[in-house]
């Protein structure tokens, strides 16, 4: 089992462990530096350990804010993914988990933000207490520094009469910190799966608060409220001796009044590179959005599915890739991902869009396909296209055996792959590595995806004519059927074609037994590397991951299942 787990999970584990290790190192190193550094001795007198907690979490925040934009820079990831020299094997598959890493980094930002905020609330209160009338000793002496000429202050709170909330809102750091916190709350809460499923538009718009987040982050340290002793002051002012003789600071030559300065802001240095990279990403998207997209065909399918055929200058794709589509007449800002359902051999590229939210429903209305004939092509809404981008499905042809599994509308990514196989068979081209494809499709009603059943029928016919029927083995499972359908199916069971799908391969009714399926595939292909590709529900994804681990051989010479899930 450990070997089987390593096949599919080791890469993700190593990445997560490395990320955690860097965070731990930065936090611990910074924490102890601020705990022991002599320049911050007097600062610690006022703030105590909260100083180290605030600064350590700040460094980790800077590190994670540096990383957060990289996983969503699609063109950068596609560039790296296409560089086989830099990205091979299991590490290439990690690029397909970019959104998982994006979420992991976001959790890191959230955790460190909470630590940072709580620590600074303690700091603010302790600064405030330092100006209290009953404050005494070294604490009072340090808090009063800055009142006399030629003195620099250590305590940014200059009076006890003003409340801590007012003090917070009177500083650059306080205002920007509040803005950063609110932006983070909006972004995190709107990123829950429930919000993304029920109102993708809310998720999309609130995520663009990141612009305000990074601007506030860049100037957050400009207030320099955390101050330490200057190097010149440390040279003249012996902290070890002078801390016990604070009453003599004004008179004793050995203990001149300590001078303090704020630390130079550094957050912008951490974020500058990724922000510039992401700015280039958005410029590329803007440029692509203004390239002309010609809609050549519109087809309305059952169950509110819209098929669009398009052309665009210099558009080159590979099987399994996806694009982002914008329709300015529906929303001038929103971009939505859709997998390509056309093959590279075709002179157009296509997508199938199902109405499953406000934006897609509005798009279908814009094309007037709800119960009406498609619009004339000249009156079609303008579309902008960004992409294509590579996903995990692009690796189907890199395995000798590939198992493709889809549920419901998740079948669309496999249309391009199967079409590509179909064209290669038509052109008598060989598939260098791929020798067998197992395709599983689980849906409630095949009629809802009539277009895909037609594709399978064409593929089945062509491959049979070419004598390559052995290359593809497909299994359709229908989960939505009633008693009347069952009787109808039973009466026509002996017919050569399936009564529901019209295919030679009979459909199954219910759900597949994955233990039996994986056991049979492992038996059919001993000593093979088998790629398992899935697009569908999270629950089934967990089941398939478990099957890949369970049926991968411990023996390096045995069968190995490599799990890949399509993510947007």
Swiss-Prot record:
Enzyme class: oxidoreductase
Topological relation to the membrane, as annotated: Multi-pass membrane protein
Co-factor requirement: heme
Regulation: Activated by the ototoxic drug cisplatin. Activated by NOXO1. Cooperatively activated by NCF1 and NCF2 or NOXA1 in a phorbol 12-myristate 13-acetate (PMA)-dependent manner. Inhibited by diphenyleneiodonium chloride.
Annotated ranges, domain Ferric oxidoreductase: 55-284
Effect on the protein of changing residue 408 to R: Defects in otoconia biogenesis
Stored InterPro entries: Cyt_b245_heavy_chain, FAD-bd_8, FAD-bd_FR_type, Fe3_Rdtase_TM_dom, Fe_red_NAD-bd_6, FNR_nucleotide-bd, RBOH/FRE, Riboflavin_synthase-like_b-brl
Keyword tags: Cell membrane, Glycoprotein, Heme, Iron, Membrane, Metal-binding, Oxidoreductase, Transmembrane, Transmembrane helix
Tissues showing expression: Specifically expressed in inner ear by the spiral glanglion neurons, the vestibular system and the sensory epithelial cell layer of the saccule. Weakly expressed in skull and brain.
Disruption phenotype: Mice display balance defects, a tilted position of the head and abnormal performances in motor coordination tests. This is associated with the absence of otoconia in both the utricle and saccule of the inner ear.
EC number: 1.6.3.-
Glycosylation sites: 238
Domain of life: Eukaryota
Localization of this protein: Cell membrane
Catalytic reaction equation(s): NADPH + 2 O2 = 2 superoxide + NADP(+) + H(+)
A GO CC annotation given for this chain: cytoplasm
Pfam families: FAD_binding_8, Ferric_reduct, NAD_binding_6
GO BP annotations listed: detection of gravity; otolith development; response to gravity; superoxide anion generation; temperature homeostasis
Protein name: NADPH oxidase 3
Source organism of the structure: Mus musculus
